[in-house]
Amino acid sequence: MRLVLFILLLPVCLATPFHQKGLFDFMLEDEGSADLASTDDPVISGFGPVCPFRCQCHLRVVQCSDLGLERVPKDLPPDTTLLDLQNNKITEIRDGDFKNLKNLHALILVNNKISKISPQAFAPLKKLERLYLSKNNLKELPENMPKSLQEIRAHENEISKLRKAVFNGLNQVIVLELGTNPLKSSGIENGAFQGMKRLSYIRIADTNITSIPKGLPPSLTELHLDGNKISKIDAEGLSGLTNLAKLGLSFNSISSVENGSLNNVPHLRELHLNNNELVRVPSGLGEHKYIQVVYLHNNKIASIGINDFCPLGYNTKKATYSGVSLFSNPVQYWEIQPSAFRCIHERSAVQIGNYK
């Protein structure tokens, strides 16, 4: 009986402990069995491109931000669609830095120390749509930017010139951000933006320009020129902007708006003229068909005319105002005729008072 029991327990004693196999184990096992089956066949690796040291790679997104990098990492995965290099110490973008990145759609270079971009650095990026160059030391935007670009953001640099050649062929750009640069009106070449047929949004805020740039494309729907040194608005500055819906001119030194200027922007819906030197409400608001929001607070407006905001007749079609700000002006609310706001149906839409 003891002999029979010993024979039954012997296989159990000799058995190895159970080990749960993962995917990696099976891959190794398959690789080993393949080697045993044929030693002449080449070994094909199952791993994808190697992620650059200290970077993180996931689903074709390569994140190399906040690493103190002084140059673009080498051997970036060729299937990368988004490359994040922000918050580093990169000083130069060289030819070949982005070789093989034919599928890159977005490149983030924000908050580095970039002062130079080689002429052919972006040449391989045939599908690049978004280029973020803000918070660097660039004095000019580079030429030969990819024709596929739809969005360029380069605020907070040292840009003092905008040449027409830089934007030539950039027919797909929709958004252009160039604020907080030491840019002057004399540094913007006449018609610099004319070739940008799809440009819809442009922001040149907090610079030293003294007038609205000339030759802006008619495709514009938003123009933001806040925080500059513009002293007046003339009709020529807004000429041809028939699709403009939002115009930002706050925090300038504007003291006058030429008669007829608003006729050049017939589809305007928002006008921001707060924090300027205006002494009267801009002419043309009453006859403007679509304007709904007008910011005029923090100016020097001392009186409101009965037809400044509303058309002469009651039967004239006009969009309803949703916001009119007049606070922090010398005009007193009791000096304003109630009929001056006859086309405004909501009392809360008008803000008056608080002048010191």
Swiss-Prot record:
Glycosylated residues, chain numbering: S45, N208, N259
Known role:
May affect the rate of fibrils formation.
- Primary residence: secreted
Q: What is this protein called?
A: Decorin
Q: Name one GO molecular function term.
A: glycosaminoglycan binding
Q: Where are the LRR repeats?
A: 70-90, 91-114, 115-138, 139-159, 160-183, 184-209, 210-230, 231-254, 255-278, 279-301, 302-331, 332-356
Q: Which Pfam families match?
A: LRR_8, LRRNT
What family name appears in the similarity comment? Answer: Belongs to the small leucine-rich proteoglycan (SLRP) family. SLRP class I subfamily.
